[in-house]
Amino acid sequence: MKIYEIVPVALGKKMPDVLIKNVNLVNVFTGKIEKTNIALYKKRIAGIGDDYKVGKEVIDAKGLFAIPGLIDAHVHIESSMLSPTEFAKLILPFGTTTIIADPHEIANVLGVEGIEYMIKSTEGIPLNVYFAIPSAVPATNLETSGATLGAEDMVSLVEKYPFRIIALGEVMNYPGVLDCDRDLITKIEILRHKYKKIDGHAPGLTGKELNAYIDAFVRSDHECETKEEALEKLSKGMQIFIREGTAARNLNALLPAVNEMNHFFFSFCTDDRDPNDIIERGHINGIIKSAIDSGIDPIIAIRMATINTAKYFNLRSMGAISPGYKADIVFIDNLKDFNIKFVIKDSKIVVEDKRINMNVESIIRNIPNTLGKINIVKNYSLSIKNRNRKIRVISVKSGTLLTDELIVEPNVEKGYVVSDIDRDIIKIAVFDRHKASGYSIGFVHGLSIKNGAVATTIGHDSHNLTVVGTNDEDMNYAISRIKELNGGIVVVKNKKLIASLSLPIAGLMSDKNYGFVVEELRKLKNSLVEIGVNSDILMQIHFLQLAVIPKLKITDKGLIDVEKQKIVDLFVEV
């Protein structure tokens, strides 16, 4: 659209394509609510005011409140287990019209091919999808990934997709920043000199180390767990993305840090949410509603989901309902209940009565093959000989990705260390599924599995094959079924398959519609009850490999002391 086309519409000399009348417009600039009309032309807002009376199409909002299209500041589409187009279909009815996606999950499996698949498969759909190019593929040198993304790859991608790539993805390797790792610093320098944002990931970082991290032009963080952590990072110039995902939920802990003076430096993100969680709790709209219910002023909550994020990422025509801005508008009943009535995207009604009323298909349909599919070592054993020492155990906690390290006496049978169901300590193994280079074995506490096993090819960030279980027989059977699926999730009991979900796209995403995935995932979660689990542990299992979030994790190379960034032995020296 040309400027000379829209100016006559704003002046009333040319009829708008769409006139929306009787609107209670939430103005994120003034913080006020205005009873007015909105004139739309092509994909833009031409003007706002009572002077606009006619349009080629007229929509009577009947007093509904109009807010800007919602923005997710940081999300991994792959965590939904849906293809990008199916993810769009799922979140659009919840009012999200823009996301900043970090495709480092598929990048760790497929490299550049995976990133290009995500970019191309989101072209031409009614969702603004921008990308933060992954900064760490692999995330650390303590795991085996399916690909490596170097500085030259980044230059090529940014030059090829200059308007789609708007940031460097979360810099998880903060020890690499502090050690001035040449490759990582080069990537940061390349992106910042192309005027892209540098997104952060620095759980618990404080003091001089935080200063040094920010010196590397890192300007955001979504890993804050406490009010104090958020306020320190904010005081040093960081944009705080308040995360409310499936496994990691930080909203309640961080809202006390938000006030009338500083709220412009807070945004909302989901990071990682599975589709069932989105259906049950909504998307960014659900976070806004929870914030309002917790006492946050509705205007402030809306700003945190719109204009704050747009300004941080320099999305200059998004995040507000204003002349010249994109015509992405969400209509809700009121500012308390926050029920979405319809959604306009690019001047077209795309959602009405919670249903998408237009085709949501990308311009490409080619799905990349998984590299090597599920390629693990042929001869392996899950047995662990006792060494007459205490063992390290990963301890998971609900509502956080942080883990603890337990030092305990092992449960020994016939000279081998085995699971201890009474103490909720079970065996875990991680296999390199990309190059069949090896595997490691450990123990995890807090999953509550009583009898059976769970195996999955989702394992942040290199996404190697993880299997947890109470006995080796079920674990071995789960591994065999995962190989047959060529990736996915399986639940096994007494060497019988209880439930499964096939994820053929890189072992991370389904090629089926979101309704199918939601139903299969529901069956999968219900099946966990049969092995003794009363809560959803899948997302917790999926993060047990993440060697950049403290304290103790496990990769295909062994147990990882995250704070020291080194491999540690299962058995503890006394």
Curated annotation (Swiss-Prot):
GO molecular function: adenine deaminase activity
GO annotation, biological process: adenine catabolic process
Pfam families, per database record: Adenine_deam_C (PF13382), Amidohydro_1 (PF01979)
Coiled-coil regions, chain positions: none
Cofactor(s) the protein requires to work: Mn(2+)
Catalytic activity: adenine + H2O + H(+) = hypoxanthine + NH4(+)
InterPro entries the UniProt entry points to: Adenine_deam, Adenine_deam_C, Amidohydro-rel, Metal-dep_hydrolase_composite, Metal_Hydrolase
Keyword entries, A-Z: Hydrolase, Manganese
Superkingdom of origin: Bacteria
E.C. numbers: 3.5.4.2
Recorded family membership: Belongs to the metallo-dependent hydrolases superfamily. Adenine deaminase family.
Record's protein name: Adenine deaminase
Originating species: Thermosipho africanus (strain TCF52B)
